[in-house]
């Protein structure tokens, strides 16, 4: 989503691996490599430091070892993370796997993929329930003034008078534009410390700068709004 352009407000879609891509369904197959690049899902304890959860395996697709993934962002938007990554990291309870993806494509509102070494429907069905992660470095590059929601979480929010408003705890898509959920410390009715929340539209009229290096967002917003 563009921090300076309210016309880009519909681009972000989800809080995990969230994309800001154009809302066009991808029908073409994204090839993960040559068919000769073989291998099977491998148990692993090593886990990428930049792993981001982007979906979950919900079913098999067809008879030849393809899996169906419900994405945390609409296919063709957030689903692009799955299409772009050549390796997925899977987690189900205490079980962790690393798998190379041979092919992937969108299918309706899901992403379907062929993991290396998974050759039939039964093997694909055995993968149901795995949460799917990809490395943040595998996300497609964005245009200027576009941001992944996952990169906004945790950033400090201040107004133009340098008054601290809190930190981004999450994002909401209301169908028109994205909204930042900004948590800040407060005092409850019982006098005990608690947290409260501000909802700030993530559109150019309010969001003035997003400095990811400084982990700060400057907004035109007052503390008593």
From Swiss-Prot:
GO MF term (any one): ribosome binding
Key words of the record: Chaperone, Cytoplasm, Ribosome biogenesis, rRNA processing
GO terms, biological process: ribosomal small subunit biogenesis; rRNA processing
Record InterPro entries: PRC_barrel-like_sf, PRC_RimM, RimM, RimM_N, RimM_N_sf, Transl_B-barrel_sf
Main localization category: cytoplasm
SUPFAM superfamilies for this protein: PRC-barrel domain, Translation proteins
Cellular component, GO annotation: cytoplasm; ribosome
Coiled-coil stretches: none
Pfam families tied to this protein: PRC_RimM, RimM
Subunit details: Binds ribosomal protein uS19.
Free-text domain note: The PRC barrel domain binds ribosomal protein uS19.
Stated role: An accessory protein needed during the final step in the assembly of 30S ribosomal subunit, possibly for assembly of the head region. Essential for efficient processing of 16S rRNA. May be needed both before and after RbfA during the maturation of 16S rRNA. It has affinity for free ribosomal 30S subunits but not for 70S ribosomes.
Protein's UniProt name: Ribosome maturation factor RimM
Organism from which the protein derives: Burkholderia cenocepacia (strain HI2424)
Underlying gene: rimM
């Amino acid at each position: 989503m563009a921090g300076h352009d309210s016309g880009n407000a519909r681009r972000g879609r989800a809080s995990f691996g969230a994309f800001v891509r154009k809302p066009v369904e991808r029908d073409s197959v994204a090839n993960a490599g040559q068919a000769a690049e073989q291998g099977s899902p491998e148990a692993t304890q090593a886990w990428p430091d930049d792993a981001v959860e982007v979906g979950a395996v919900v079913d098999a697709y067809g008879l030849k070892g393809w899996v169906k993934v419900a994405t945390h962002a609409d296919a063709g938007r957030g689903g692009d993370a799955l299409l772009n990554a050549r390796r997925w990291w899977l987690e189900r309870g205490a079980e962790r796997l690393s798998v190379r993806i041979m092919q992937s494509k969108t299918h309706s509102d899901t992403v379907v993929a062929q993991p290396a070494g998974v050759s039939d429907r039964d093997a694909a069905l055995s993968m149901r329930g795995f949460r799917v992660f990809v490395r943040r470095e595998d996300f497609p590059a964005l245009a200027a003034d576009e941001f992944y929601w996952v990169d906004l979480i945790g950033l400090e929010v201040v107004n133009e008078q340098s008054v601290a408003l809190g930190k981004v705890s999450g994002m909401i898509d209301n169908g028109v534009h994205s909204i930042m959920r900004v948590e800040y410390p407060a005092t409850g009715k019982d006098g005990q410390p608690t947290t409260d929340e501000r909802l700030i539209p993530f559109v150019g009229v309010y969001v003035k700068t997003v400095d990811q290096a400084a982990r700060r967002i400057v907004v035109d917003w007052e503390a008593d709004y």
